[in-house]
Structures are given as C-alpha cells and as structure tokens.
Amino acid sequence: MAREKEIEIQTRLGKQRILPSKVIYFPRGIMGFENQHEFTLLKLREDAPFLVLQSIDDARLGLLVADPYSFLSDYQIKVSDAEQKLLRLRNIRQVAVLVTVSIPPGQPDKTALNLSGPILVNHEAKLGLQVPQVEGKYPAQVYVHPQNETKVAAADARHPDDGGAENW
C-alpha cells in the first residue's frame, strides 16, 4: 500500500504538515467565509479540549472549535433532510459535532461556546457543514466556566455516538 504524501500548510501557529485524507470539504464554506471550502482539524495539545478548524488556503483563517458534549451533555441540534443529504449521512456515527469557541483577550474566564452555529463533520466522507440553529432551546452562547451566567455540564461528559473529533 502506498503511503500518503503529507502536504504543508501555513497557519497562524506556523507550518503544519497534514495528510490529504485529513482535508474536509465544506460545500457551502463557513458563515462569513463562504469562499473557503477546504479545512482540516488541528490539535493544539493532546490534553486540550479545543481544536483549530484551519483553512487549507488561508493561513489567517483558523477557528477555535470544541466538542460541545464535553461541556454540555444534553446539547441537541436539528439537521434537515437536505443537510443530511449534503453531508451524505447514512448513520449518526459518521458525524462529529463541533461548535466555535470565543475567548475574549485577557478574559479566559469568559470563554464561550457558540451553540447557534454548530459545525457537522462527516469523518467518513470528509464533508463538513455549518448548520445554523434557528429555533433552539439553548442560548446563542454558553460560558464554559460555571461561575459565569450559564451553568454547563461536567467537562467529562461525552458525546453518545463516540464519533467525535478525537477521531482526527
């Protein structure tokens, strides 16, 4: 079997080498970056709860993301039939759910998860899609630190499908 040749991409964190099989195609791009279609997930550290959804073509475009179920065990999203078809979903185990994370400069205690725009990744088909949640039972943002306004579930809660981002 031939070994896959790594590609080198530029990021704000410096040069990164990734396998082409780790490239995720977003047919609609990401909100605000609709012209960017190819991304990959980069680990910041092995023990960190966050990943970077990094554009392959734009070194400046890297979004901090996290598995929402690590913080909020009962998080639920609605995915339309059309969105499932676009993602080529046959089974819920094919998908990882991610949300963007915001950390205000100098205020890590105000780290928040954006629950209104989850990002779904079919890790088998290497397809991604941001799925806005218009009518959800959750606020747009949830703080990850319990001392803030919204209390969240314990950090050791896990997504029930075991198909999370750790597969990357």
UniProtKB/Swiss-Prot annotation:
SUPFAM superfamilies (UniProt xref): BH3618-like
Pfam families, A to Z: FliW
Gene Ontology CC annotations of this record: cytoplasm
Biological process according to GO: bacterial-type flagellum assembly; regulation of translation
S-S bonds: none
Keywords: Bacterial flagellum biogenesis, Chaperone, Cytoplasm, Translation regulation
Main location: cytoplasm
Localization, UniProt: Cytoplasm
Subunit structure comment from the entry: Interacts with translational regulator CsrA and flagellin(s).
HAMAP family referenced in this protein's UniProt entry, alphabetically: FliW
Family to which this protein belongs: Belongs to the FliW family.
NCBIfam families xref list: PRK13285.1-1
Its job: Acts as an anti-CsrA protein, binds CsrA and prevents it from repressing translation of its target genes, one of which is flagellin. Binds to flagellin and participates in the assembly of the flagellum.
Protein name, per record: Flagellar assembly factor FliW
Species name: Oleidesulfovibrio alaskensis (strain ATCC BAA-1058 / DSM 17464 / G20) (Desulfovibrio alaskensis)
